[in-house]
Amino acid sequence: LVRCSFSNRSIESLIHMHYSFGIDFDPDYQRGSVWNDTDRAKLLDSIFAGRSIGKFVLRRVPYDESLTKNCLYEVVDGKQRLLTLTAFYENRFVYHGYTYNDLPQEDKNWLKSAMTSVLELPESTTEKEVLEVFIAINQNGKPVDDAIIEHAKELLQEEKKNG
């Protein structure tokens, strides 16, 4: 059993972890970058609406491994979201006509101060345990099927009509 630590962090703090300590986005078990600009915009829409963007799972990299990887963390869950946040922060994509630098200061402050949950796997976590966590996160549960999503969209349209 892996003893994990939970913390709530601001988006700014999460981005700071990447720039200050390094986060490996590409451990062997991770898929590549698969989100498009629509997916990225939906994430930022959620942040600006004050909705949860889910938790991030990071593994503290063992010291000897950190020397070769040149980073202190690896992303176990939340890669697409974290790539989106760093890409936007670096002005590498446009969100509703704005790069990060073009955002009004009030919106920058909102984005940076938005809170999210981070689960940190300790340095002592073995590769086997990391893989078990990754599989459990990505395999467990039952996704909502398309019919339920369509029904919710129909209900939303009806609500919009009724004002």
Predicted regions, residues:
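Basic- and aromatic-enriched surface patches that contact anionic nucleotides/nucleic acids
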Residues: 1-13, 19, 23-37, 41-163
